Amino acid sequence: MNRRTDADSWDPASSVGATATMVAASRARASRGPDALLDDRLAGPLVRAVGLQPLVRMIDGDTAVDDPPSSPRSLNEQIAVRTRYFDDFFTAAGAGGIRQAVILASGLDTRAYRLNWPSGMTVYEIDQPQVIEFKTRTLAEFGALPCPDHRPIGIDLREDWPSALRQRGFDAGQPTAWIAEGLLVYLPPEAQDRLFDNIAELSTPRSQVATEHFPDPNGFSGPRAQRLSERWHRMGMDLDMAELIYHGDRNTVIDYLADHGWRVRARTFEEMHAHNGFEPPDDEMMALFGGMSYVTGIRK
């Protein structure tokens, strides 16, 4: 595959879009069986509709992910920790009175359809036009219903997405809950800063943002990227992490948010496993995600 360019685009079966489908397949796998760790009943049908056969086989259980020393249980726990963190973030924001939610780079995220949103909540989703069109059309064909006020927006986050958001009725005078899940490494370093600058500009006090933080902002280059690529290849996916991410020095999330008007709380990868009642992550999970924190910022 080719290295990223500033004008590239994708659908759920290609490039960065395929990684979103892979995450959906992980949610589907963790939602299977009597010991399911998640309840995302739409993830599996979406993955089937995309049609990437290695991922279809994975959710069907027809092929094991040959990924020692990580067990299937460890892999399911990892995606459960991540998914629950952002689910709980939105649930708490709604309980606290926030009535605007924005899912940035939503991919095959189904929260607009499966979370119990409070009355009056408006949920915006932003992603590539092909991704938004595929998901909304496919879920409509399945008969899935989103929350009553669901406003998907097809635009690249490297473009003027704040204007597109306002055009769909976003009210910058009201507190908002934002998530940027699994997104930042796919943005150029300057676009990451611009993303958080735009979020800050659109956020009144009491607004909240949730994302992930790595103490080494270039942590997904080098050995981590190689490990992920090897895992994907064993699954039958022709993806190379080093070709999908943007390289170069970037600001650390916690410091950038703290320096730009947010009160920040971070919970480590290991802490969140314990919070969910899981055993400590195994060595392979730590090699991939050790040092990572889940971060919430509250606008001052």
Curated annotation (Swiss-Prot):
Annotated GO MF terms: methyltransferase activity
Stated name of the protein: Putative S-adenosyl-L-methionine-dependent methyltransferase MUL_0817
Gene3D superfamilies: Vaccinia Virus protein VP39
Classification via InterPro entries: Ppm1/Ppm2/Tcmp, SAM-dependent_MTases_sf, SAM_mthyl_Trfase_ML2640-like
Residues where S-adenosyl-L-methionine binds: 127, 156-157
Enzyme Commission (EC) number: 2.1.1.-
A GO BP entry: methylation
Keyword annotations: Methyltransferase, S-adenosyl-L-methionine, Transferase
Domain of life: Bacteria
Enzyme class, broadest EC rank: transferase
Role of this protein: Exhibits S-adenosyl-L-methionine-dependent methyltransferase activity.
Organism: Mycobacterium ulcerans (strain Agy99)
Family that this chain belongs to: Belongs to the UPF0677 family.
Pfam families reported in the protein's UniProt record: LCM
